């Protein structure tokens, strides 16, 4: 089974927090979007 997407904080307290979230999201979609044969 595929893990759930990263939890989105209600508020981003810093630019770093936002960037970390976006990075995790990209990693998640890279895994989920991989074609399965």
Swiss-Prot record:
Q: Does the keyword Secreted apply?
A: yes
Where it sits in the cell: the answer is:
Secreted
What main location does UniProt list? secreted
Q: What is the lineage of its organism?
A: Eukaryota, Metazoa, Spiralia, Lophotrochozoa, Mollusca
Quote the record's miscellaneous comment.
The mature peptide does not contain cysteine residue.
The UniProt similarity line reads: Belongs to the NPY family.
Q: Name one GO molecular function term.
A: toxin activity
- UniProt name for this protein: Neuropeptide Y1-like conopeptide
Alphabetically sorted, this entry's keywords are: Amidation, Neurotoxin, Secreted, Toxin
The chain residues annotated with the modification Phenylalanine amide are 37
Write out the GO cellular component annotations: extracellular region
User: What's this chain's function?
Assistant: Causes hyperactivity such as jumping, rapid circling and tail flicking, when intraventricularly injected into mice brain.
- InterPro entries from the xrefs? Pancreatic_hormone-like (IPR001955), Pancreatic_hormone-like_CS (IPR020392)
Q: In which tissues is it expressed?
A: Expressed by the venom duct.
């Amino acid at each position: 089974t595929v893990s759930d997407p990263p939890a989105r904080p209600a508020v981003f307290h810093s630019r770093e927090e936002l960037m970390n979230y976006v990075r995790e999201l990209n990693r998640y979609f890279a895994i989920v979007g991989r074609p399965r044969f």
